[in-house]
């Protein structure tokens, strides 16, 4: 995740007066402004998961995520595995930040002006359609449920790799990549809602609607304490889960209904800005690394207890990798070329086709969202592991290709 494209910061409070939680948030927020930091932490978590899952202690890695944890409120109790609480509960906070980003950009950001947003919107759609079609062309019908896996972009990794290239590239590249990635997130949310929420129990939407009504009522009453929204948000989450849809969609809903205007005389900044600023560092340095630790532990050989390859796993891994590494940049370039050719829009000032290829390569870093979609697409452990291996391979290749191409662009610019 990333901050808004042009963030407005409220005046900081004196550190000595801040509670411990606020001081931790302030520290993490300062770290998160270094774009590479989030990607580096995510990479460390993924590497730790891979090392653990392929070590002599691999059994303890898998056992950890199956440890049952219970949450009880009065006489009501919910017991699920630690893996569930990470993927289905904590990731709701990740999707809340996604919803907040989309809400802000729709209100007064790059998505508020259709003309400015048209090219990155088309680039994002091309970067979704081409990888999906390429994947479908490479796999047999039995594996087609994973078509959406190579459509996602990991903002933290992509922006982190771009930051490693330094300041020798035009600033417009970062803005374009961020805009493309935000739209990519929106498309991914729609894909999850429309294609990976089968067997919906429509009567249970009443419970979700009750939770949402509670959130909206608190807003109308002018309640601005975040903790006051937790019970209503929990009802919304539980209701969506009971419908058969993925419960993390509750985070997107909450983000999209967060107020964008501050109460006159009562708030220094709008709630959507304050909530995003508070949650962003915790998501970047807590939720996302924990998700990587819980999901990137794929056995690569006998040391990790890997089972004999099931039919189709090799093809699945290759299809995901090819669709991300080749399909993403091809889709981005093709969509933008058609848009320019048809005179629907023009390339941003200071951005050439080489820079556009760089954004396409970095968009091929799927990681977090791609692995998340894979967990929804495949019930078979063997197929899920193969899809994860494809995502990890593709993300590494896309990062290396992006670094190499970005370095070449910088060198060409300095020698021109």
Curated annotation (Swiss-Prot):
The chain crosses the membrane at residues 39-59, 82-102, 119-139, 146-166, 175-195, 198-218, 234-254, 281-301, 315-335, 353-373, 390-410. Coiled coil: none annotated. It is a multi-pass membrane protein. Signal peptide: none annotated. GO terms for biological process: regulation of pH. One of its GO terms (cellular component) is plasma membrane. Pfam families: Na_H_antiport_1. It catalyses: Na(+)(in) + 2 H(+)(out) = Na(+)(out) + 2 H(+)(in). Keywords: Antiport, Cell inner membrane, Cell membrane, Ion transport, Membrane, Sodium, Sodium transport, Transmembrane, Transmembrane helix, Transport. Its main location: membrane. It is found in: Cell inner membrane. Disulfide bonds: none annotated. GO terms for molecular function: sodium:proton antiporter activity. It comes from the Bacteria. PANTHER family: NA(+)_H(+) ANTIPORTER NHAA (PTHR30341:SF0), SODIUM ION/PROTON ANTIPORTER NHAA-RELATED (PTHR30341). Na(+)/H(+) antiporter that extrudes sodium in exchange for external protons. Belongs to the NhaA Na(+)/H(+) (TC 2.A.33) antiporter family. This is Na(+)/H(+) antiporter NhaA. It comes from Acidovorax sp. (strain JS42). The gene is nhaA.
